[in-house]
């Protein structure tokens, strides 16, 4: 195909991607996500098209900047970065232009500046050492062992068989297994070596001969060259002022060692054959059927256990984190003393006092010999912001997003990407597991310092049924994510029909043939490029029952709490006797006490009594005007993308009198609040349903209280730290901050686009 034809074909594909972002035509909506996938497949099958596509995408980015078409900037940035991660042969001039474009975007508001900064950091790394992004991604995702880059990632795919059909579960499992059967460690190491040499040597690299040589090499030889290439790139990336010439010479030595001395820059055939494609292997994915809220914690601990330095016992008790000093105000894990307590067992000279002013004397007030040392972890280490990585502009070059050293000597080398498939009910169960995990961290602080946790969501809804039997809307959160992030809508929300179509297809028993798994490719794209979290407030509800012998219970919800009025009544000597003078009618007499959300952020308590047939408390904004920074919501001490207002919809009964007698009608009233208490004032009982889940239903309720769920690790009480100053005269008193709300992050491509 001529170069002009190639450019025209790629230009048409890019325009198709842009059109689906700019129109809501049903004809285009049916193919949403497919255009982006086919565009990447074109350059994957023919890597020589990559520079042409990068130029086209850069031209469209500059056009969007000049015409202020901001809605296409982030999708185009993600597209070009995905191409650059795989590509070789991109000129320095193209890298510089894209880098300059990203730096210009830093003046724009979030999320544009956030995404642009992340892209600029990765571009700078790739410009300094070509091939670094590809190499690090493959090593981390495939868990290839290397001392110079020890980071590991794993994708945990959770599906609840109660919410997703068995055919869908089987189809997804077969597609994942078929793809991973072709991705052995040897294959991935060949890809890393081949990509690094082609990226550094360019046209001087005989790609076909290199590919054949690597295919014929035994595992031991392959591992030798793999570690040599990784060492060359990582040492080059760690230098303050890397020498491009020295880097190329070092990789040329490896190349000549593979193919022989004649394969230098001037060696080889003058006419090169078409270079073979170097695919980017899909990440290592483990498939799990959801069994309960404890499963997430256990799987994450098992992920850490094999190669970590944590000493995890059978009951998941934690460990002594080495390298922590008490004078850094760090928490105290229980450390079992090895001191026998007998004076003669002390080493010689142990009872001699150190010289005044020596380091040992300065630390004397901070240590004691023997006994059980107990530390309380500082508040900042236990917050979601420090756990999942600060949600903003802070990224570290060469490390997965959110990773780094939280504690001295403790690095977060593991990244767990938890992907859940299902509807709103599955998200409610995930919120329960997330809350349970955070509570465990207050007692067993083993995941936080070692693990970066990223949450992802792909909606899988049941096929549409007739209107008479259709369930309530179960894709509310997915609809919200698609509304605030158009690229999520285009790539993720459109996967549901494709997943059901895959489940209807007969399984293929031939695993030897190479296929293009569309669903797995889109999942992989979302996992890699979805780096911007949207934070959702988790709410806690305290429930009181009509049976006074039954203790109140507490639960949490993420999306919705629905209240229905039961037909049954509780006895007159129950929790709350029926008031006299209350007219009979539909519904129940309710007392509502809530804190009204005001523009001034001043607390204002409102108490009202009314007759209602039901209530719904919604935690997800219903429209774009309620997203991020609404004037009716008090601003929380958290990222600007938080949502901490409940939308309360009350179906109120209105009594009217006319010539025919008394009649009743209903009207829906809506207000917004953060905290609310609701109590039945007559003999009617209530039924509560959390997150639309039939398994999370509470009956015979007379009163309940709803408030933002606090971060389990935070508190308002005082704690005294028995650490003295150098003179041993003062006691430090640490006052914990006001409890922070517990926010659950779900990763998207851009966060909230205003």
From Swiss-Prot:
Instruction: Identify its membrane topology class.
Output: Peripheral membrane protein
InterPro entries, alphabetized: PIK3R5/6
Q: Which GO terms describe its cellular component?
A: cytosol; membrane; phosphatidylinositol 3-kinase complex; phosphatidylinositol 3-kinase complex, class IA; phosphatidylinositol 3-kinase complex, class IB; plasma membrane
Q: Spell out the residue ranges making up region: Disordered.
A: 343-363
Coiled-coil regions listed:
none
What biological-process terms (Gene Ontology) are attached? angiogenesis; G protein-coupled receptor signaling pathway; immune response; positive regulation of angiogenesis; positive regulation of MAP kinase activity; positive regulation of T cell differentiation; regulation of natural killer cell mediated cytotoxicity
Q: Where in the cell is it found?
A: Cytoplasm; Cell membrane
Q: What Pfam family does this protein match (any one)?
A: PI3K_1B_p101
What keywords tag this UniProt record? Angiogenesis, Cell membrane, Cytoplasm, Membrane
List, in alphabetical order, the Gene Ontology terms for molecular function in this entry: 1-phosphatidylinositol-3-kinase regulator activity; 1-phosphatidylinositol-4,5-bisphosphate 3-kinase activity
Tell me how this protein assembles.
Heterodimer of a catalytic subunit (PIK3CG) and a regulatory (PIK3R6) subunit. The binding of PIK3R6 to PIK3CG may exclude the binding of PIK3R5 to PIK3CG. Interacts with beta-gamma G protein dimers. Interacts with PDE3B and RAPGEF3; form a signaling complex that regulates phosphatidylinositol 3-kinase gamma in angiogenesis.
Q: Which PANTHER family match?
A: PHOSPHATIDYLINOSITOL 3-KINASE REGULATORY SUBUNIT, PHOSPHOINOSITIDE 3-KINASE REGULATORY SUBUNIT 6
Instruction: Relate the protein's function as given in its record.
Output: Regulatory subunit of the PI3K gamma complex. Acts as an adapter to drive activation of PIK3CG by beta-gamma G protein dimers. The PIK3CG:PIK3R6 heterodimer is much less sensitive to beta-gamma G protein dimers than PIK3CG:PIK3R5 and its membrane recruitment and beta-gamma G protein dimer-dependent activation requires HRAS bound to PIK3CG. Recruits of the PI3K gamma complex to a PDE3B:RAPGEF3 signaling complex involved in angiogenesis; signaling seems to involve RRAS.
Instruction: Supply the name of the protein.
Output: Phosphoinositide 3-kinase regulatory subunit 6
Organism lineage: Eukaryota, Metazoa, Chordata, Craniata, Vertebrata
**Gene symbol?**
PIK3R6
């Amino acid at each position: 195909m001529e170069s002009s034809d190639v450019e025209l074909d790629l230009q048409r594909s890019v325009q198709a991607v842009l059109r689906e972002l700019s129109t809501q035509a049903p004809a285009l909506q049916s193919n949403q996500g497919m255009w982006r996938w086919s565009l990447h497949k074109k350059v994957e099958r023919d890597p020589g098209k990559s520079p042409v596509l990068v130029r086209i995408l850069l031209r469209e980015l500059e056009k969007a900047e000049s015409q202020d078409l901001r809605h296409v900037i982030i999708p185009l940035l993600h597209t070009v970065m995905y191409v650059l991660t795989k590509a070789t042969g991109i000129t320095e001039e193209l890298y510089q232009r894209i880098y300059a474009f990203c730096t210009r975007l830093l003046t724009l508001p979030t999320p544009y500046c956030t995404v642009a900064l992340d892209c600029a950091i990765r571009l700078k790394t790739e410009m300094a050492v070509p091939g670094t992004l590809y190499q690090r991604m493959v090593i981390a995702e495939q868990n290839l062992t290397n001392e110079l880059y020890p980071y590991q990632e794993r994708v945990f795919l959770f599906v609840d068989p109660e919410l997703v059909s068995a055919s869908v579960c089987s189809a997804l499992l077969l597609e994942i297994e078929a793809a991973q059967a072709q991705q052995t460690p040897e294959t991935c190491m060949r890809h890393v070596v081949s990509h690094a040499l082609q990226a550094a040597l360019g046209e001087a690299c005989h790609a076909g001969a290199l590919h054949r040589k690597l295919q014929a090499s035994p595992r031991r030889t392959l591992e030798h060259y793999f570690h040599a290439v990784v060492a060359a790139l990582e040492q080059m990336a760690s230098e303050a002022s890397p020498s491009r010439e020295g880097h190329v010479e070092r990789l040329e030595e490896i190349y000549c060692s593979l193919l022989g001395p004649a394969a230098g820059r001037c060696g080889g055939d003058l006419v090169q054959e078409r270079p073979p494609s170097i695919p980017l292997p899909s990440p290592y994915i483990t498939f799990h059927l959801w069994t309960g809220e404890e499963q997430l914690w256990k799987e994450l601990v098992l992920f850490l256990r094999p190669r970590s330095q944590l000493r995890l016992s059978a009951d998941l008790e934690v460990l002594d984190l080495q390298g922590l000093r008490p004078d850094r105000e760090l928490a105290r894990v229980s450390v079992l003393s090895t001191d026998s307590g007998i004076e003669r067992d002390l080493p010689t000279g142990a009872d001699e006092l150190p010289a005044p002013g020596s380091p040992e004397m300065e630390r004397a007030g901070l240590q004691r010999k023997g006994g059980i040392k107990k530390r309380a972890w500082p508040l900042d280490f236990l917050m979601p912001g420090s756990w999942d990585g600060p949600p903003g502009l802070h990224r570290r070059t060469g490390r997965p997003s959110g990773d780094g050293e939280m504690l001295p000597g403790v690095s977060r080398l593991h990244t767990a990407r938890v992907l859940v498939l299902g509807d709103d009910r599955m998200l409610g169960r995930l919120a329960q597991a997330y809350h349970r995990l955070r509570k465990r961290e207050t007692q067993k602080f083993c995941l936080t310092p070692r693990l970066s946790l990223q949450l992802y969501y792909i909606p899988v809804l049941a096929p549409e049924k007739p209107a008479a039997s259709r369930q309530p809307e179960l894709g509310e959160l997915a609809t919200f994510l698609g509304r605030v992030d158009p690229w999520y809508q285009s790539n993720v929300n459109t996967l549901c029909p494709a997943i059901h179509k895959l489940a209807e297809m007969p399984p293929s028993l031939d695993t030897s043939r190479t296929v293009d798994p569309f669903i797995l490719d889109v999942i992989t794209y979302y996992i890699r490029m979805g780096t911007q979290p949207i934070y959702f407030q988790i709410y806690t509800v305290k429930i009181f029952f009509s049976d006074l012998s039954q203790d109140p219970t507490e639960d949490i919800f993420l999306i919705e709490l629905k209240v229905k009025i039961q037909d049954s009544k509780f006895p007159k000597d129950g929790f709350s006797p029926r008031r006299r003078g209350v007219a009979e009618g539909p519904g129940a007499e309710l007392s509502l006490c809530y804190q009204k959300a005001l523009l001034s952020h001043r607390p204002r308590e409102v108490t009202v009594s009314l007759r209602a047939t039901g209530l719904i408390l919604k935690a997800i904004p219903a429209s774009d005007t309620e997203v991020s920074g609404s004037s009716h919501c008090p601003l929380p001490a958290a990222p600007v993308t938080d949502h901490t207002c409940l939308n309360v919809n009350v179906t109120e009964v209105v009594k009217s009198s006319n010539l025919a007698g008394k009649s009743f009608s209903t009207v829906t009233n809506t207000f917004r609040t953060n905290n609310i208490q609701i109590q039945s004032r007559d003999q009617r009982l209530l039924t509560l349903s959390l997150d639309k889940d039939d398994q999370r239903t509470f009956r015979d309720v007379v009163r309940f209280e709803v408030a933002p769920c606090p971060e389990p690790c935070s508190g308002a009480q005082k704690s005294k730290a028995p650490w003295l100053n150098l003179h041993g005269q003062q006691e430090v008193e640490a006052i914990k901050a006001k409890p922070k709300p517990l926010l659950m992050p779900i990763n998207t491509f851009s966060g909230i686009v205003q």
